[in-house]
Structures are given as structure tokens and as C-alpha cells.
Amino acid sequence: MNERQTGGEGEIVLRKVFEGDLPIFFEQQQDKAANYLAAFIYRDPYDRQAFNNHWHKIFVNPTVVNRTILYNGQVAGYLGKFEIEGQPEITYWLGKNYWGKGIATGALTEFMKELEERPIYARAAKDNFGSIRVLQKCGFQITGYDRGFANARGQEIEEAILQLG
């Protein structure tokens, strides 16, 4: 399960998410600019108990697949596959310090090799050009748009719906 790939000047490794990764994920999700771009975040990203409860539900859900992204041995973020109404969907988060190095693209490329389900979907705020570009580099295509309430922005916004396969 430890998939390896290079990203920029470093090594990308995917591994199982450990409980010890959660404080790093929580810290990464405190960045206001990152939350704005992600848009569809927890109601209160600063509520550690809500964050821990959310991850506990993830850990016990057999349909969820999670991987921690390591970059040069450091926890850079995570990837996940979950289901909404029986449809597989992926999500990912990368700490801001790791943006712009090809890490998200490299990690998602490896993750998609592990997941055999197709079609598989992803969503991103329509103005999150970086995330949409990562998804497109990994073969996802925009199939439409939807609107949803973005907690990070306090309003309804448009989101791109992407599909692979």
C-alpha cells in the first residue's frame, strides 16, 4: 500500500492514515486561505472535537478509503474515497506549505491506481482553479456544475463536478 512517486524534488508516499496524523491534518486546516479555496469545509474548522468526531466516523466506515500523503517523510496531507448515494467520490487536502510542487497530482495519480471503481467523481469550488487543474491532470473531466452552501464563504457558490471513467 505504500505507493511511491516523485513530485518536484521529493518523494511522495501514500500510506494508511494513522490517528497520530490527525493533529497535523487539523493544523493544516486552520489556514484561512486554504479553507476559502476548499470552500466546502466543516461548519467550524477550529472545533477540534467536531474534527475528531468526523474522523472517527471515517475510521469506522468500511466504504471509506484513506491515505496519508507523505512528502520526503513528512505528513503533507491526505486523500480519501467515500460514497454519496452509492456514488464513489474522492477528496483530498494538502497543507499549504506543499502547494505548487506537484505533490497533489502525484499523490492523486497513485491513489487512482489503487481505486478500481469507475466512474468516480470529485467536486471543487468553480474558482478553485488549482484543484480543478490537479483533477484534470489525473484524467478527470468537468461534467457539470452545481450549487451548494460553502461554510468557508458563508454563502452558496458554484462547484464543478468532475468524473473519471
Q: How should these model regions be labeled?
A:
Residues M1-P23, E27-K32, Y36, N66-G165:
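Acyl-donor (CoA/ACP) binding surface of acyl/acetyltransferases
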Residues A33-W55:
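Conserved GNAT-fold acetyl-CoA-binding loop/helix
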Residues D44-D47, H56-K57, N97-Y98, D127-N128:
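Juxtamembrane/interface motifs at transmembrane-helix termini
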Residues H54-K57, F149-A150:
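Short, P/G- and charge-enriched loop/turn segments at secondary-structure junctions
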Residues K57-T63:
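Short loop/turn motifs at secondary-structure junctions and domain boundaries
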